[in-house]
Design a protein with these regions (language model features):
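Glycine-rich phosphate-binding loops of nucleotide-dependent enzymes
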Residues: 2-252
Length: 252
């Protein structure tokens, strides 16, 4: 049941007392997290801290053993399937791009825009003017307008990452979960991506899982996880000065 605090404050994501064990190992241990509308939040933590399991729980891939997970204050995500949660407005991008490389950049966005329609319908029926206008908007946001007619497989790694973010944006999500988007990027691509994520936050909430240096580029609130719980939260300078974070994350 939602707490008084969460009812009084509008939230996009509310997690309270969430726990998940696998064969006796607590991957998530009494996790509490609140994401507000339009917030850009960075999730930080070493391997095994619980970041992936947390995102799996939010998207319905994994069910928690206990705790509350609510979307928009009122939707109990633990009662819905992955597909239902995606259709509600929660999008997830994994670390490795999953664009269809044999289709053009435009066609990838068209397929994403189709949403509930079948791929066959998307490929063989004309896109309405409203759909084309939405795709043009997404091209403006992700900066790939001049690449729309080339095959997605010909894009650079950073461009593929931006295309996949665009594919999520085409579906107009309220909450985006993004897994290590800058992995394998050049410094220039990383800077461009940080600006993109800052731009798209505001109209929607964005949760980015990444390392501390990329979080600095985002200028976002950071939440540090350790052993499935929140270890520290605040600005990057604040969490980096936290003695427990220094001990656990930086290994000093």
């Amino acid at each position: 049941m939602l707490s008084t605090l969460s009812i009084q404050e509008k939230t996009v994501l509310y997690m309270n007392g969430v726990t998940k064990s696998f064969d006796g190992f607590k991957a998530i241990n009494n996790l509490n997290l609140v994401i507000k509308p339009g917030e850009l939040r960075a999730i930080i933590g070493p391997n095994g801290a619980g970041k992936t399991t947390m995102m799996d729980i939010i998207t319905g891939k994994t069910r928690p053993d206990q705790g509350d997970v609510y979307f928009r204050n009122e939707v109990d995500l633990t009662r819905h399937s992955e597909a239902e949660i995606a259709n509600m407005g929660i999008g997830r991008k994994f670390q490795k791009p999953t664009v269809i490389e044999t289709l053009s950049v435009f066609d990838n966005l068209e397929l994403a825009l189709a949403g509930k329609r079948r791929v066959w319908d998307s490929l063989f029926f004309a896109l309405p003017d409203s759909g084309r206008a939405r795709i043009d908007e997404v091209f403006d946001i992700v900066g790939l307008g001049d690449r729309r007619h080339i095959l997605a497989g010909a894009l650079a790694h950073g461009e593929k990452q931006r295309l996949e973010i665009g594919m999520l944006l085409a579906q107009s999500p309220e909450l985006l979960l993004i897994d290590e988007p800058a992995a394998g990027m050049t410094d220039e691509e990383t800077a461009q991506l940080a600006e993109l994520l800052k731009d798209i936050a505001g109209e929607r909430s964005v949760v980015v899982e990444h390392d501390m240096e990329f979080v600095r580029a985002l200028d976002a609130t950071g939440t540090v996880l350790h052993e499935g719980s929140v270890l520290a939260e605040g600005t990057l300078d604040k969490v980096q000065a936290n003695e427990r974070v220094i001990e656990v994350y930086l290994g000093r």
